[in-house]
């Protein structure tokens, strides 16, 4: 065990994490040069294109150090984005060390800070590394000062590297061997292994990536999950180098995979502990307590996904089920909307997660989708004291039956150059934010706000990028539910509610939002043969109205002079026809109308 080193890499998007991983794998001969490709560990196309890592991946590498000994290095690649923060914390807790990669030309960013704090909380040894030193605008001194200021770890011995050219890679490996502690585990205790990640393979079922903490697991042994109690047989186990390589046993301190013919990803939850099923003569039996830190992931953001053609419903369900095989944090259930027909209510970890799911559905499964406005989960206390969770505006009970509504509040860390503090604070205040803290680190400022999650999910991130010209970065974590004066605004067309257009907003903005949506609808819905009234209402109170005037045919064109009664008869006849049409005619709500809600500007 003394020759094992488990480490991961923490970095902001685009600071060169995957490139560094490629270099380390190449240096340790993990893949032959012909198998090397850019971003080896990012296996999904969308990961490569967006330059982000979504699922954790690993590589077990052999490195011959300068002291002549051979070390087993386990590189555990972590996702870097705030939506996947639970997966990050699980990946990090499987390591003893982490490389903090900072782009020497840009300095520290908010997500790096968030993940770095997670690592320090878990007691992981953090080694700072300055990447992109081959760039002319690299400024190592400022970057070092920022690391010390913001994260508070000593950066005087930060290693200068360039992952692109391969400079300094050996120094990094030597530092890992020298500074990262060997795994702390008991080889002779009952088996305990933590699931770092799991994914679905169409041939063998679920593949679990695990870190063995105590004991050992042999091929063919039966093991059980401690959270669910389900038991399976380990048909196949081994390590990734990043290519799959079978072994007979996984020992304490190692990181490897287990294949046990599990059909559903839900059975292998990230963060769960694996132990042996029962005591046999040749083993130590099950462990008594699970490893700490496991929690069920709760979706934070909900949106409706509907197929554009009604006959595509089954195809969409298949696509979602297949996606769920590889993404246990995606929740969905069927729902029916009067306006959009059959579809699904989906729950996501955050906005990036939602975008990725949508993009994968469109790209990998050729689905044409309509997405309703994203909403968050509200806690509603009904008149009789019952508490329900409402994740869909159309499910909100009537105003009269509600005692109070609580909305989710998140703590947001905003990180930006000091020139943009003003505009960013204005934006946060518009979104009902409460400032909690403000710290200066050199030229960078870190603002801490408490904001309602409902204000963030719509367009906060885009606005933040535009007011700070792209320099600000943010990360957020859920804090609590808090009573709030929010109301549901319904949109009516000719007195009929259109459920998919309902929104939940704070009372102070309800008038304004209602008017804005009604005005937007007026632009989008085409003119009919009769007047169309668009109304926004809170309960029975109408707060805004727009009217789309009818198209009109001139029935008097054929009359010439003559008696007024003749003209009046024709006009009355037209009026009666319009009235009859208005009673039976329905208004087609075009696709754009549902997206328009998202674009209603503040």
From Swiss-Prot:
GO terms for molecular function: GTP binding; GTPase activity; guanosine tetraphosphate binding; ribosome binding; translation elongation factor activity. GO terms for biological process: positive regulation of translation. Keywords: Cell inner membrane, Cell membrane, GTP-binding, Hydrolase, Membrane, Nucleotide-binding, Protein biosynthesis. It catalyses: GTP + H2O = GDP + phosphate + H(+). SUPFAM superfamilies: EF-G C-terminal domain-like (SSF54980), P-loop containing nucleoside triphosphate hydrolases (SSF52540), Translation proteins (SSF50447). It is a peripheral membrane protein. Its main location: membrane. InterPro entries: EF-4 (IPR006297), EFG_III/V (IPR035647), EFG_V-like (IPR000640), EFTu-like_2 (IPR004161), G_TR_CS (IPR031157), LepA_C_sf (IPR038363), LepA_CTD (IPR013842), LepA_IV (IPR035654). Its EC number is 3.6.5.n1. GO terms for cellular component: plasma membrane. It is an enzyme of class 3 (hydrolase). Disulfide bonds: none annotated. Residues 2-184 form the tr-type G domain. GTP binds at residues 14-19, 131-134. It comes from the Bacteria. It is found in: Cell inner membrane. Required for accurate and efficient protein synthesis under certain stress conditions. May act as a fidelity factor of the translation reaction, by catalyzing a one-codon backward translocation of tRNAs on improperly translocated ribosomes. Back-translocation proceeds from a post-translocation (POST) complex to a pre-translocation (PRE) complex, thus giving elongation factor G a second chance to translocate the tRNAs correctly. Binds to ribosomes in a GTP-dependent manner. Belongs to the TRAFAC class translation factor GTPase superfamily. Classic translation factor GTPase family. LepA subfamily. This is Elongation factor 4. The lineage of its organism: Bacteria, Pseudomonadati, Pseudomonadota, Betaproteobacteria, Burkholderiales.
